Amino acid sequence: LTLRVAVVGGGPAGSCAAETLAKAGIETYIFERKLDNAKPCGGAIPLCMVSEFDLPDHIIDRRVRNMKMISPSNVEVDIKLDNPDEYIGMCRREVMDAFLRDRAASLGAKLINGRILDIKITENGKKPYVLSYSDFTDGNNEGTMRTLEVDLIVGADGANSVVAKAMDAGDYNYAIAFQERIRISPDKMEYY
């Protein structure tokens, strides 16, 4: 009997889960709807995560050792790392996510450029779950409707999780990430 697992969401959590499953010889499918998705969140990663994700140097765009954080109420916090070997790695999420997905795929996980539309949860888990999805692999913006039966589902599809909704995990009342771009005059900037 071969265990089949769908990992919904191909960001860091989903890709690392898929990598672990594939290493264990489990038939693994990674679903990601936007393979080139540039996201504002998660671009700053601490040194411990660089080693935990086993990221190569080319994934890290910049190594930040000094920064200033300013809250909306104008409270400032200066962060300085004294050890020259320590840094916060700045990376582009679309680059890091693609690297992690590709690594999982190289171990046998099957990457599906698709969007989950529906999940049929079976009674008592005695039958496989049925995922209905739009497959964008052929480049068609509408996608081709497909289904896949799996034994387990890993929900790594973010704040508006289709998996969480399907299992009635409840609603989220708080934003967990945001991005704001502001223009600052050069005399207000500090360079390190």
Could you describe each region identified by the protein language model?
Residues G10, R103-Y192:
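Predominantly flavin-linked oxidoreductase catalytic cores and closely associated redox partners
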Residues E19, K23, S51, D102, ...:
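Short, well-ordered alpha-helices that flank and scaffold nucleotide-derived cofactor binding pockets
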Residues L1-V5:
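Extreme N-terminal starter segment of soluble prokaryotic enzymes
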Residues G14-S15:
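N-terminal Rossmann-fold NAD(P) dinucleotide-binding loop
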Residues D82-D102:
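Short beta-strand to alpha-helix junction loop
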Residues A6-G10, E19-C41:
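Glycine-rich FAD pyrophosphate-binding loop
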Residues R33-P72:
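N-terminal FAD cofactor-binding segment of flavoenzymes
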